[in-house]
Amino acid sequence: MESASSSLATSGRRRSSSGGGGGSWGSIGSAADPFDIPAKGAPVESLKKWRQAALVLNASRRFRYTLDLKREEQREEVISKIRAQAHVVRAAFRFKEAGQVHVQQKEVAAPPVDGALGFGIKEDQLTALTRDHNYSALQQYGGISGVARMLKTDTEKGISGDDSDLTARRNAFGSNTYPRKKGRSFLAFLWDACKDLTLIILMVAAAVSLALGITTEGIKEGWYDGASIAFAVLLVVVVTATSDYKQSLQFQNLNEEKQNIKLEVVRGGRRISVSIYDLVAGDVVPLKIGDQVPADGILISGHSLSVDESSMTGESKIVHKDQKSPFLMSGCKVADGYGTMLVTAVGINTEWGLLMASISEDSGEETPLQVRLNGVATFIGMVGLSVALAVLVVLLARYFTGHTYNPDGSVQYVKGKMGVGQTIRGIVGIFTVAVTIVVVAVPEGLPLAVTLTLAFSMRKMMRDKALVRRLSACETMGSATTICSDKTGTLTLNQMTVVEAYFGGKKMDPPDNVQVLSASISSLIVEGIAQNTSGSIFEPENGQDPEVTGSPTEKAILSWGLKLGMRFNDTRTKSSILHVFPFNSEKKRGGVAVHLGGSESEVHIHWKGAAEIILDSCKSWLAADGSKHSMTPEKISEFKKFIEDMAASSLRCVAFAYRTYEMVDVPSEDRRADWILPEDDLIMLGIVGIKDPCRPGVKDSVRLCAAAGIKVRMVTGDNLQTARAIALECGILSDPNVSEPVIIEGKAFRALSDLEREEAAEKISVMGRSSPNDKLLLVKALRKRGHVVAVTGDGTNDAPALHEADIGLSMGIQGTEVAKESSDIIILDDNFASVVRVVRWGRSVYANIQKFIQFQLTVNVAALIINVVAAVSSGNVPLNAVQLLWVNLIMDTLGALALATEPPTDHLMQRPPVGRREPLITNVMWRNLIIMALFQVIVLLTLNFRGTSLLQLKNDNQAHADKVKNTFIFNTFVLCQVFNEFNARKPDELNIFKGITGNHLFMAIVAITVVLQALIVEFLGKFTSTTRLTWQLWLVSIGLAFFSWPLAFVGKLIPVPERPLGDFFACCCPGSKQAADAKGDDADHSDV
């Protein structure tokens, strides 16, 4: 279910790290447990292994919403073929061009083109140009400017972008969409539901029963038994298919959201944000590091632009793009630098569009919890099958020895006196009972419950500003023990403004008071701001305020530049950019070399970045009058004092410096791409302090995490003083005087040995001046210590840490596409409070699954014991096939819907994280389950054996008395499940009604179940072998079921040991003990 772009890299990104899901059945299992798979990047062999681990009765039903391994292989084959085809075409053109390298080329006229709805070039010609990387054709069209003219595009201002222009371009060159394979139809889900082996057997039994019933009793009375079983099976099939189909539609919608990338385009001279689907041929698109190339196109201009084309070519090679290699392919990622491109082909006309149209997106996904529950289902299924076979043997033995009786008390089988039809009908009845026991005993609804709760949670999380890219992240988030959060934009508002400035050797007050500076230093500052930026300024012709675009830091600096009197476009035209060193989060600075317009030889190299890092490279500084002075130790101390003062006020400190250079020393244009900009002997211009306010509510969110047993750690590129001030403001630090290792600098952490790093990682609350690699080292150290780590990130260099973490959380607003594709969840509003809401939902997923397990196993145990004991002792079962199918429907589908959609509560954030290797069935669940199951078994078996006298039916004839008694047992059993559903909502809370009015679906399902039960008992007796009950018996039935509530209340007062029950069994059994030890060792040495 990952986004289109990430799906191509799935196979390459597989890895076998990350802790798995833990034991399948309590503590059952070993280090080689096939049902224990990693949460991220599980090897294909592991995924194949668990499917073959044990007897699986209903594979088609069991493996719903798990990874379709065969389809994954087919998808890879399709991708490989399309890549190979593209390779051949491009190789042919390159070979042709290589032969022309030493041939003197004459001026070639542009080939004849036919106008396309008023444009100077046709769709197929434009598509072929970029698809084939045909540089010769580009030159014949007049280069990039010629193609732009044909597309009626201004390379500076873009297209006009009005509705008529966009419509004309879509009509001429297509839209940036591609035909998607339709999702599976409802009929396909119906067919899958029909493949359930036990249901097939029941349908066969229904057909045989129908035929024999009509033969022996006539059509008027003989069709009831067979038809009622068939109808019950059909109902199960329809409800199952409907539920699956609904979940499928939800996942499709979420998949659409994941692919709907927002990007900037230049239209009418201004940068605006549009959906990737709204892109048209002729659009001018700015590109920066981490962006996905949104369509095929040609590079207009770029600086140090490198592109990762591995998603299209399959080769992990970074390709440099310039005027000699200008073709950009849709779907590729910008690895470095920035530039602008002209869109030439969109949608299905691109290689990416063809690729996406050829593969299916909805490939399913494995989640550890799904696999663990499949392990539980397999174990219980084997027990159920064994019991059903035992019941079958016992009933057949009793039948053929004359120990089974008809409702009127007569013997069912008398040797030599029974016809073949009657004998077969009796055997079919017995066989149906045994198969139905399997239906009830095998909890196929467990994996479905995971899908239901995940789909529900994902839909609700969208409203809470979180887009889930990987299903298993939902459940893993519930186990998170630590969150490593960025500062900027996550803990802060990302609304930056320059509030302090130190230029010319003194503080400017206010910070835009340019009058204190000479014209020479002012022009240098403005030149450095305008040229050394990836942002832009649009100046409206009507005199309105300029529109500033770019990253928050760039916008703050550009806005400050405007206050200094900077005219952005004029300043940029006064000098030309020779080379750019894009801002790098490792080096924490960016630079640009510009050739001054009025001089043939003078070059300025401007640097901007972290204040103390720029300061270390400066040998001199400029005074307010423009005079140059050496950087003395006293002056360095003065600068450092100003930096510390700003940092103590939680300001981000950015320094500006420059140096002069000679044009003769600048490398020639063909070698300039490898030029390393000089960063020594710099001249300090000054420092600005940028304020980024702390987000409202962050302190409360951090406090909530602490109460939930989750430690929040701040990892930032800012210096330690700024980091300390923000951490105190956000509540991450409580003591301003803490020292290492609680607050540590990235380089200090980096210098530690592996063992020291692990020990320090436990204590770290704040890491300042950290690089993306430091964040990665912190994540690895924490995971080695057994933590389940969630990490936030927005930059391209954050991708390794996001991928390494148990849960990678990227930012939806400031995050790059590379970061988003390496993440598991996208935080759409970049807000830390949304991260905490994701934790709540993660815990809710796990809690809801446990509620459903408790509820379902109670039904399993009670139904099995009642029918087995009754069958063995009397030869008859109180709950027949149709009744058990109805119970199965309540339990598997309606129960899953009711309990899997419980919204998260504050109670979830008042307990520690759930360990992923903790048993799925806790001691609290065992206690509740045993109490409820015992209560139901005792009550219903008492009714089975003493019901006639207890219900005062002795005066009735035997057949009617038995029918009333069995109906009463069936009715009480179903009502017990209804009342127990309320108990299951709050397994460890006394108030089971808390928040119940907020869950409308739960209330609706309970109401529907009760109404249908009343209809079945009162009006559908012919089909279900029941009879109408008096209102007195209804009251008694409700009273017995109601007793579940006070019993559960008292039961919850019984304390349970903290140690899992499985450990007690392991202590008693040497083999189990070894297995448990092995599992413990595995946990210690895994990446959990």
UniProtKB/Swiss-Prot annotation:
Disulfide feature: none
Segments on the Extracellular side according to the record's topology features: 220-221, 360-375, 447-851, 902-919, 1022-1030
Catalysis: reaction(s): Ca(2+)(in) + ATP + H2O = Ca(2+)(out) + ADP + phosphate + H(+)
Membrane topology: Multi-pass membrane protein
GO molecular function: ATP binding; ATP hydrolysis activity; calmodulin binding; metal ion binding; P-type calcium transporter activity
EC class of the enzyme, as a word: translocase
Cytoplasmic side, ranges: 1-198, 243-338, 397-425, 873-880, 941-1000, 1052-1088
Gene3D superfamilies membership: 1.20.5.170, Calcium-transporting ATPase, cytoplasmic domain N (3.40.1110.10), Calcium-transporting ATPase, cytoplasmic transduction domain A (2.70.150.10), Calcium-transporting ATPase, transmembrane domain (1.20.1110.10), HAD superfamily/HAD-like (3.40.50.1000)
InterPro entries referenced in this protein's UniProt entry, alphabetically: ATPase_P-typ_cation-transptr_C (IPR006068), ATPase_P-typ_cation-transptr_N (IPR004014), ATPase_P-typ_cyto_dom_N (IPR023299), ATPase_P-typ_P_site (IPR018303), ATPase_P-typ_TM_dom_sf (IPR023298), ATPase_P-typ_transduc_dom_A_sf (IPR008250), Ca_ATPase_N_dom (IPR024750), HAD-like_sf (IPR036412)
UniProt: Mg(2+) binding residues: 794, 798
Keyword Amino-acid biosynthesis found: no
Superkingdom as given in the UniProt entry: Eukaryota
Feature: compositional bias, Low complexity: 1-11
SMART domains in UniProt: Cation_ATPase_N
UniProt keyword list: ATP-binding, Calcium, Calcium transport, Calmodulin-binding, Cell membrane, Glycoprotein, Ion transport, Magnesium, Membrane, Metal-binding, Nucleotide-binding, Stress response, Translocase, Transmembrane, Transmembrane helix, Transport
Annotated TM spans: 199-219, 222-242, 339-359, 376-396, 426-446, 852-872, 881-901, 920-940, 1001-1021, 1031-1051
Inducers of expression: Induced by salt, drought and heat stresses, and abscisic acid (ABA).
Glycan-modified residues: 532, 569, 737
Enzyme Commission code(s) on record: 7.2.2.10
PROSITE patterns recorded: ATPASE_E1_E2
Record remark on domains: The N-terminus contains an autoinhibitory calmodulin-binding domain, which binds calmodulin in a calcium-dependent fashion.
Stated family: Belongs to the cation transport ATPase (P-type) (TC 3.A.3) family. Type IIB subfamily.
Name of the protein in question: Calcium-transporting ATPase 5, plasma membrane-type
Organism of this sequence: Oryza sativa subsp. japonica (Rice)
